[in-house]
């Protein structure tokens, strides 16, 4: 790195800090913290434990955000001042030290950007993920299985816990359907970026002629809703089907009709669970899945979310990411516009950078609007 590159980097980082400031509005955070302090000093504050807890969580979240912002802003300012001073005094040792620390400075900005992206009301919640293959039989079933493995490896890398709720094996290979819950800090905040259609292009291992095939799978991600969130579900709007579990493992498989499928007739949302031997427990889990899906459905309606998955055939029109393995190797996300050549690593779960690029891109677009 030379002096020109370093000064350009500082300018770029300073612009990012200004953009972040416009989004998080630090002055408003300080006003809100003062309001919370006044509320906490009221004698009746602890009369409502639930409300007090919610206020405490809000205070912690916005305090941490403000602290990170101030630290980053101060680090950029200090770097500017120290560089100008060292440059004026021809202090090469200090200048080289600043050059070496440039990546660390850039990482601080990126971490702040990601913290800003994951500050939504539901981002800290667990995530319920469902993968559905599109038309194409064995090809699409295998692609859905590859995506499932990719997410399992991602969760392993991030220290998230995964609990499979429903697993339907494909007739020849792969899977027909899978639903699982991901538990961990900001699980939904990260995985919500995976909501959409994923497209695979490759030479088929199931085609003796070795022809190129295109497959699609949809990924649906919902926040796990708290029990105290009121989602009204009327019994008359539900159709319940019971069937024998067909997933991998478990001595109860194919012996009793313990698996449960629930269809919410007004929205067409379908959830199913065969995780437990008990039909009652599977029904309770499926109802929780339905509640989470309906909660996400209402959020999408209210926010007119652009990334809402439409009730249509899985195909070309709604894809968020393409994974091309032949005739060249590239993964490209249509939202961030970023392309990646490390296809093997990505399919092995190395998707955090892709997700973070999408989150930053979406926030930047929303800020421009």
UniProtKB/Swiss-Prot annotation:
Modified residues (N5-methylglutamine): 251
Record InterPro entries: PCRF, Pep_chain_release_fac_I, Pep_chain_release_fac_I_sf, PrfB
Coiled coil: none
Assigned GO CC terms: cytoplasm
Keyword Ribosomal protein: no
A matching Pfam family: PCRF
Gene Ontology terms for molecular function: translation release factor activity, codon specific
Location of the protein in the cell: Cytoplasm
PTM description: Methylated by PrmC. Methylation increases the termination efficiency of RF2.
Main location: cytoplasm
The keyword Cytoplasm is annotated on this UniProt entry: yes
UniProt entry keywords in alphabetical sequence: Cytoplasm, Methylation, Protein biosynthesis
Source domain of life: Bacteria
NCBIfam families: prfB
Function as written in the Swiss-Prot or TrEMBL entry: Peptide chain release factor 2 directs the termination of translation in response to the peptide chain termination codons UGA and UAA.
Family: Belongs to the prokaryotic/mitochondrial release factor family.
Name of the protein: Peptide chain release factor 2
Organism (species): Campylobacter fetus subsp. fetus (strain 82-40)
Higher taxonomy: Bacteria, Pseudomonadati, Campylobacterota, Epsilonproteobacteria, Campylobacterales
């Amino acid at each position: 790195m030379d002096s020109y590159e370093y000064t350009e980097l500082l300018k770029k980082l300073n612009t990012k800090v200004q953009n972040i400031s416009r989004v998080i509005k630090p002055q408003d955070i300080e006003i809100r913290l003062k309001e919370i302090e006044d509320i906490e000093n009221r004698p009746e504050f602890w009369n409502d434990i639930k409300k007090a807890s919610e206020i405490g969580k809000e205070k912690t979240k916005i305090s941490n955000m403000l602290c990170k912002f101030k630290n980053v802003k101060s680090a950029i300012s200090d770097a500017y001042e120290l560089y100008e001073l060292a440059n004026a005094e021809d202090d090469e040792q200090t200048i080289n030290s600043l050059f070496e620390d440039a990546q660390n400075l850039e990482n601080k900005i990126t971490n702040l950007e990601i913290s800003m992206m994951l500050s939504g009301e539901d981002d800290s919640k667990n995530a319920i993920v469902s993968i559905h293959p599109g038309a194409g039989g064995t090809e699409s079933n295998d692609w859905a299985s590859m995506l499932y493995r990719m997410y399992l490896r991602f969760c392993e890398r991030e220290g998230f816990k995964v609990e499979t709720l429903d697993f339907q094996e494909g007739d020849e290979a792969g899977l027909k359907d899978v639903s699982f819950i991901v538990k961990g800090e900001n699980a939904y905040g990260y995985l919500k970026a995976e909501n959409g259609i994923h497209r695979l292009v490759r030479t088929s291992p199931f085609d003796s002629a070795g022809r190129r095939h295109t497959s699609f799978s949809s990924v649906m991600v919902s926040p796990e809703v708290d029990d105290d969130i009121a989602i009204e579900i009327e019994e008359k709007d539900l159709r319940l089907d019971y069937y024998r579990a067909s997933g991998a493992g478990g001595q109860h498989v194919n012996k009793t009709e313990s698996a449960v499928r629930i269809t919410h007739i007004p929205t067409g949302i379908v959830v199913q669970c065969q995780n437990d031997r008990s039909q009652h427990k599977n029904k309770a889990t499926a109802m929780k899945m339905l509640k989470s899906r309906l909660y996400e459905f209402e959020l999408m309606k209210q926010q007119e979310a652009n990334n809402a998955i439409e009730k249509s055939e899985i195909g070309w029109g709604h894809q968020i990411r393409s994974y091309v393995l032949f005739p060249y190797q590239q993964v490209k996300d249509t939202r961030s516009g970023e392309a990646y050549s490390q296809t093997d690593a990505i399919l092995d779960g190395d998707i955090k950078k892709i997700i973070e690029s999408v989150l930053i891109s979406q926030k930047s677009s929303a800020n421009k609007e």
